[in-house]
Amino acid sequence: MHVATLGLGANLGDRLRSLQSAVDLLAAEGVRAVASSRVWETDPVGGPPDQPPYLNAVILTETHAGPHEVLAACNRVEAELGRTREIRWGSRTIDIDVLLYDELIVNEPELTIPHPRMTERSFVVLPLLELDPDPILADGTRILDLAVDAEGARPYAPPLVLP
């Protein structure tokens, strides 16, 4: 059994429902959430101006799938929930990122683990710290040693319901 850490985000439609639906659909894909952070509301980072705020959460999942299969499952769930990829860092109904997968380091065009920008984003780091108070990446980086700007991030809802 493998552990994949996923970041979830949504800023269009019923944002909270989209996050919960993603958890439920991922379980049907064999990527079952075993822990969830609280849901955080965060200001958009990058992308077009005047985007609505995001809801974000981090989930720990267990799966028999490999990292590429987990990414494929995330992409299928995004498509099922209406995700379109028209504008880089634009608004979206759902975004699911593979942040970590066991202690694996992957550096390929279609998949990079650890996620290359996860340590720069409060909407990833703050929820991740709820699940692991002192996470250490496969390359030895301690997240607590990094300066992350928490401005614009605020708790919004309790953890997502696990399947």
Predicted ranges, named:
Residues 1-31, 37-43:
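N-terminal beta1-alpha1 ligand-phosphate binding loop
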Residues 30, 35, 39, 45-54, ...:
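Flexible, gly/pro- and Lys/Arg-enriched active-site loops
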Residues 63-66:
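Helix N-cap motif at beta-to-alpha junctions
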